[in-house]
Amino acid sequence: MAFSLENLRPAPGSRPKSKRVGRGSSSGKGKTSSRGHKGQGRGTGKVRMFFEGGQTPLFRRIPIKGFKNRNAKEYVIINLSTLEEVFEEGNVITPEILLEKKIIKNLKDGVKILGKGELTKALVVKAHAFSRTAKEKIEAVGGKAEVI
């Protein structure tokens, strides 16, 4: 028999039988239907997530700490290893070229070049920010690191 959507069945024993509750006392799951007597869990409905029974919940006991700076610049980060792979000796690299070649998806607040990886080609890199190691590595091979 060939496989098709209409004859797919779960492997025998892979799906547990459903628990049939409230079907008489001789079933073993009658009367209280495994819910016990009294208490919050005996009725219908669920307790909402993180509800701790009325005590002050954890998220309110822990102090508020820190904040998100609204003026912080969010740079798109590129490592030297990426520039080494994609560009040839003597190329001028600008954020617009990086967008064209689909190395970055968007500009956000600008491009920052980081120093991960080795650089062997002399490149002219124009970006909004450079890490100290990136600038040193670019200039060590005879390239230029220009801040826009």
Swiss-Prot record:
It comes from Kosmotoga olearia (strain ATCC BAA-1733 / DSM 21960 / TBF 19.5.1). The gene is rplO. GO terms for cellular component: cytosolic large ribosomal subunit. Keywords: Ribonucleoprotein, Ribosomal protein, RNA-binding, rRNA-binding. InterPro entries: Ribosomal_uL15, Ribosomal_uL15/eL18, Ribosomal_uL15/eL18_sf, Ribosomal_uL15_bac-type, Ribosomal_uL15_CS. Binds to the 23S rRNA. The lineage of its organism: Bacteria, Thermotogati, Thermotogota, Thermotogae, Kosmotogales. This is Large ribosomal subunit protein uL15. Part of the 50S ribosomal subunit. Belongs to the universal ribosomal protein uL15 family.
